[in-house]
A protein has these predicted regions:
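Extracytoplasmic/periplasmic substrate-binding proteins
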Residues: 50, 110, 249-331
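Mature extracytoplasmic/periplasmic domains
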Residues: 120, 271-272, 276, 287-291, ...
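Conserved C-terminal helix/tail region of periplasmic/extracytoplasmic solute-binding proteins
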Residues: 169, 256, 382-440
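Hinge/lid segment of periplasmic solute-binding proteins
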Residues: 107-159, 184, 212-213, 243, ...
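Extracytoplasmic/periplasmic solute-binding protein
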Residues: 146-154, 159, 184-236
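Extracytoplasmic "Venus flytrap"/periplasmic binding protein-like
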Residues: 66-134, 169-178, 281, 291, ...
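Glycine-centered hinge/linker elements that transmit conformational signals in sensory
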Residues: 187-189, 232-263
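A structural signal for short loop-to-beta-strand junctions that line the ligand-binding cleft
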Residues: 93, 100-101, 128-167, 312-315, ...
Length: 440
């Protein structure tokens, strides 16, 4: 599976008053962060992360310091592991049971492929508390919080587009399109005004040698309800379904119609091109907000990609990662209490101050672009969707990473691209295509 590099935001956010208070752990004698929760005897546990120097690392360090201040008897030793082989190190440490009590864990199928050494948290933290965290089910067994939550989310992330308001105004576009038909009208106006509508390439994160197609695919597949995405996993809905091909045919028309750059396969400057005003739109995520605001100021806007025949009413809002407890941890009460502490308003404020979007229901941010993104599901009736590359088999993701890009560039037909994805799926054993999600 493609390893997403979680590039955190460089600006500070803030939590508004009135957040829901965290509940006490079901196995403790006090609220999270209180001395009565874990006793007063000296305890040392370790925490591994792969954040480097990102804002996620700042949030983690500040959470640890705040928790230790509440518990002078507790020492949490932070270990920053290399990102490129982080999960290999975790797996090796789990075999010898020499790893950490707490560890950064990615959500979706990343969690499920590692669940053999993760501790379910439902007996330590009340389900009512866990369910206050948006998207907590995506770090749970079978993506069902009732079946056992493994990960307490650290932050929320979005897949979204960015657009240049000044270029839209120059082309005479007064409102952002909401469906395929309106989008095609808009890109035609931009082209007529001599403006490149979209730029595609490696983007802000540089996840692959070409562009990352799953920002787009997530929105194209919103023609199905969230629950029906499981049919893509089981094969009940084939990737070669005519409805999916119809979506891809509309999508690739953006490139074949001349509404993108011509070098979509090898453009390494797409994000910089957008920031410098050379294109009206680009696909990214919330990790790009800070750079976009710095470069374009009030001229930058965020949008929900309107890759739908009907007005789009879904948004990718997903807890990209968080912390889990290993099942071989020798001080589970302390580790669980730290995770419970992460659900409290005080901890969520620390997360926000580091420039991340907290996952607690009712939280918000002072940044206007993030506020707009949060408002779609919170206030406008949009349905929250996961990142599709986190909930379909990694082998299919790997195939799609090349075939979808080739189809967009016009070097492969959409039918062939989807057939290769379907062939990859059907080659997997039945256990990997069952009604129960598994990581491997």
């Amino acid at each position: 599976m493609v390893q997403r590099r979680f590039v955190a935001l460089a600006f500070a956010s803030s939590i508004v008053a009135g957040l829901l208070a965290g509940c006490s752990s079901s196995t403790s004698t006090g609220a999270p962060g209180s001395p009565g929760a874990i006793g007063t005897a000296p305890v040392t546990i370790s925490l591994w992360h792969n954040y480097g120097t990102e804002a996620n690392a700042t949030a983690t360090d500040n959470l640890v310091k705040a928790y230790e201040a509440l518990h002078p008897n507790v020492t949490i030793t932070e270990v920053s592991q290399p990102a490129n082989n982080y999960f290999d190190l975790l797996k090796a440490a789990a075999i010898s049971k020499t790893g950490p009590c707490l560890a950064t864990q990615w959500t979706g199928l990343f969690t499920l492929q590692d669940q053999s050494y993760l501790e379910p948290l439902n007996s330590y933290i009340p389900l009512s508390t866990l369910n206050q965290l948006k998207g907590v089910q995506w770090g749970a067994a079978n993506f069902d919080a009732n079946s056992g939550v493994y990960v307490v989310p650290l932050e929320m992330q979005f897949y979204n587009g960015f657009y240049n308001k000044a270029l839209f105004a120059q082309a005479g576009i007064t409102s952002f399109p909401t469906d395929w038909a309106e989008l095609m009208t808009a890109v035609q106006k931009l082209k007529a005004a001599g403006i490149q509508a979209f730029t595609y390439g490696t983007g802000a994160q540089g996840l692959t040698a070409g562009f990352y197609p799953f920002y787009d695919l997530s929105y194209m597949m919103m023609m199905y309800p969230v629950a029906d995405w499981q049919k893509l996993y089981t094969g009940a809905t084939a990737w070669t379904d005519p409805a999916i091909k119809a979506q891809l045919d509309k999508w690739v028309a953006l490139e074949s119609g001349g509404y993108t750059n011509t070098d979509v396969l090898n453009n390494t400057e797409s994000w910089q091109q957008f920031l410098s005003g050379k294109a009206a739109m680009t696909m990214e995520g919330t990790w790009g907000v800070a750079d976009a605001e710095k470069s374009l100021g009030s001229n930058v806007g965020v949008f929900v990609p309107p890759f739908s025949d009907q007005p789009i009413k879904g948004i990718v809002e997903f807890p990209g990662d968080g912390f889990a407890m290993t099942n071989y941890c020798s001080n589970k009460a302390v580790a669980a209490d730290f995770l419970n502490y992460m659900t409290t308003p005080a901890a969520q404020q620390i997360i926000a101050a580091a420039g991340l979007i907290p996952s607690l229901q009712g939280s918000t941010t002072s940044d206007p672009l993030e506020t707009q993104l949060l408002s779609y599901a919170a206030n406008q009736g949009y349905t929250r969707y996961p990142m599709i590359d986190n909930v379909i088999q990694p082998e299919v993701v790997t195939t799609a990473s090349t075939t979808l890009v080739a189809a967009f560039a016009g070097t492969m037909s959409t039918q062939d691209a989807l057939q290769k994805m379907q062939d990859t799926l059907t080659a997997l054993p039945d256990s990997r295509r069952s009604s129960t999600y598994t990581g491997s």
